[in-house]
Structure formats: C-alpha cells, structure tokens
C-alpha cells in the first residue's frame, strides 16, 4: 500500500465535550487514552468549562476514542459530546494536552 493510500485512511475529527470535565483530570486521561489507541492530535480546556479536542487516526480507533469520551475518567460527568469530521492537510505528530 502506498503512502498516499495510507494517508487517505486517516480521519480527523473535532470534538467538544460538555459537563463536569474540567478540574477532574479529563485532559490528562484523554491523552493517556489517545496514546493507548495510537491516535494523534490535541485536547484543551475552553473558557466555557467544556473541553475540545482534535483527534486524528484510523476510523476504528477514532470510534473507540469517541466512545471513551462519552464517559471520560471516573471523576468526570459528561453530559454531551459533539463531533464533526474535519478535512485537514496537517498530520499531527503525537497527541498532546494544550
């Protein structure tokens, strides 16, 4: 399989997570989960108390990450997860907390 064919299989999603998701280790746990799933991108807190993330990787792994984000770490109380696919040229090198 060529490099271009491999690149075409990589998906990128923008995600927003709402609820009690700040001050409960959500970003740190998200980084750990993303590393375990070999995903790339980032996660960050927003001023409105929600968390946003850009997740990049194979579709099956992204599906697993989205399922995990619906509950997050034990102290989190997730009330809503929204996501949309983004078409970006950039390929992230790793998954990190911002």
Swiss-Prot record:
Family that this chain belongs to: Belongs to the acylphosphatase family.
PANTHER family: ACYLPHOSPHATASE
Gene name of the record: acyP
Protein name in the entry: Acylphosphatase
Acylphosphatase-like domain span: 12-98
UniProt catalytic activity: an acyl phosphate + H2O = a carboxylate + phosphate + H(+)
GO terms assigned for molecular function: acylphosphatase activity
InterPro entries: Acylphosphatase (IPR020456), Acylphosphatase-like_dom (IPR001792), Acylphosphatase-like_dom_sf (IPR036046), Acylphosphatase_CS (IPR017968)
Keyword Translocase recorded: no
Keyword annotations: Hydrolase
Active site, UniProt feature: 27, 45
Keyword hit for rRNA-binding: no
EC code(s) of this entry: 3.6.1.7
Pfam families for the chain: Acylphosphatase
